[in-house]
Amino acid sequence: MAGHSKWANTKYRKERADHKRGKIFSRTIKELISAVKMGGPDPKTNARLRVIIQKAKDQNIPSENIERNLKKASSADQKNFEDVTYELYGYGGVGIIVEAMTDNKNRTASDMRIAVNKRGGSLVEPGSVLYNFSRKGACYVPKNSIDEAALLSHVIEVGAEDLDNDDEEHFVVLCDPVDLSSVKEQLVALGVTCTEEKLIYVPLRVVDCDEKDGEANLALIEWLEKIDDVDEVYHNMA
């Protein structure tokens, strides 16, 4: 799973979890702005916007923040956001995938080059790293909301593929991307709390590197995660 490694200590994982929460809110706001740009500011006639507004409410984003960004999105000065993906090789042959949502691709590309210049690794051509990963749907279930054995029973019942326990705060229910909406709806119908659902990358194989390379990779990943436009960083380091 993204960010999980034997070289990541408790302090690193706690800081990453706190940082990730902010990234989730930021991503939702960018999705909201993009939905308005594509389909207009009225959720009654813009189904995509309606879904994202509900998503924002589920994430406890304040209503005033939602309204402010709806107005912001309607401004001609506000650029639209687009998804971009970067692939890198870190130390010891570790593959890294970076997903970002940006209103300025040149700025984001520059930030990526700075990260590599400062922390090492190399940016590579599209497809050079992706073949080591599989695209999966993921539903995030708070660990304090359900017992793992009970959730596993539900996972089997709804036909999901796997249950991942690596995340610090959530169980992650994995499924085929095309089944994500259905799996989430079935879990919710069974009383399971799903705080987030999205598509993620899961490594097909992991790379075991030494402590020096492991720590260097974590430093690179931490730098990448702090880039404003970056939403998620995936790697295949053991």
From Swiss-Prot:
Q: Which InterPro entries match?
A: Integrase-like_N, TACO1_YebC-like_2nd/3rd_dom, TACO1_YebC_N, Transcrip_reg_TACO1-like, Transcrip_reg_TACO1-like_dom3, YebC-like
- By its UniProt entry, which Gene3D superfamilies does this protein fall under? 1.10.10.200, 3.30.70.980
Q: What is its main location?
A: cytoplasm
Is Transmembrane among this UniProt entry's keywords?
no
- Pfam families, per database record: TACO1_YebC_N, Transcrip_reg
The UniProt keywords, alphabetically, are: Cytoplasm, DNA-binding, Transcription, Transcription regulation
The processes (GO biological process) annotated in the record are: regulation of DNA-templated transcription
User: Where's it found, cell-wise?
Assistant: Cytoplasm
Give the CC-aspect GO terms.
cytosol
Q: Name one GO molecular function term.
A: DNA binding
Return the similarity comment: Belongs to the TACO1 family.
Which HAMAP family did the record assign?
A: Transcrip_reg_TACO1
User: What protein am I looking at?
Assistant: Probable transcriptional regulatory protein CF0838
Q: Which organism is it from?
A: Chlamydia felis (strain Fe/C-56)
